[in-house]
Amino acid sequence: MKTHGLTIDTANPQVLAAWWAKALGVEIGADYGALVTLVTPPDLLPLQFFKLETIAEGRNRVHPDFKTSDLDAETERLVAMGATIVQKNELPQIRYTTLTDPDGNNFDLVQE
């Protein structure tokens, strides 16, 4: 078995895919209407956005984590684009920030 990618459910896959493409510095791959993919480099899990008419309550049991060399600057950049900070976290060996994208999906930025 191999990883195919990470699918994010959304009411508007075109808008959310465009936001993530800009956030990650990648291009939109394919737009099939109900499914939009990103062109991702080999070191990034393929991302796709799937249209659901009704988004289930209690979602976000799984979320992506992204590494960054400058946690504060990257957090500021994403907030300026429409992300929301949920919580800043510091553990003995790791520093990270939990955010939501404009659609309310959780993700973490982790200091390298």
List each language-model region with its residue ranges.
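Hydrophobic ligand-binding cavity/cleft-lining segments
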Residues: 11, 16
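Short connector loops at helix/strand junctions that flank enzyme active sites
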Residues: 33, 42-44, 57-61
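Vicinal oxygen chelate
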Residues: 1-10, 22, 27-30, 37-39, 54-77, 95-100, ...
